[in-house]
UniProtKB/Swiss-Prot annotation:
Protein localization: Plastid, Chloroplast
Primary location group: plastid
The family this protein is said to belong to: Belongs to the bacterial ribosomal protein bS16 family.
InterPro entries: Ribosomal_bS16 (IPR000307), Ribosomal_bS16_CS (IPR020592), Ribosomal_bS16_dom_sf (IPR023803)
Domain of life of the organism encoding this protein: Eukaryota
High-level lineage: Eukaryota, Viridiplantae, Streptophyta, Embryophyta, Tracheophyta
GO molecular function, one term: structural constituent of ribosome
PROSITE patterns recorded: RIBOSOMAL_S16 (PS00732)
Gene Ontology BP terms: translation
Annotated keywords: Chloroplast, Plastid, Ribonucleoprotein, Ribosomal protein
Gene Ontology terms: cellular component: chloroplast; ribonucleoprotein complex; ribosome
Annotated protein name in UniProt: Small ribosomal subunit protein bS16c
């Protein structure tokens, strides 16, 4: 099973995160399938590759709680629903 999860990058006291599609059995810093976004909580910046995220969601990937909150804020789920109807 694939999950959309945050992968920590950056340096001490200055964390930034990549949003990645990764196998559920892999560690947080393990090999990812694809990088689909970027999140900087300090500057409150987010970059999302929406077509890649929609692809993984349609294939059954499950976002973690934090990633789901980021996707809701960016209104990604509104783009997903019309395609499924």
């Amino acid at each position: 099973m694939v999950k959309l999860r945050l992968k920590r990058c950056g340096r001490k006291q200055r964390a930034v995160y990549r949003i990645v599609a990764i196998d559920v059995r892999s560690r947080r810093e393990g090999k990812d399938l694809r990088k689909v976004g970027f999140y900087d909580p300090i500057k409150n910046q987010t970059y999302l590759n929406v077509p890649a995220i929609l692809y993984f969601l349609e294939k059954g990937a499950q976002p973690t709680g934090t990633v789901q909150d980021i996707l809701k804020k960016a209104e990604v789920f509104k783009e997903l629903r019309p395609n499924q109807s």
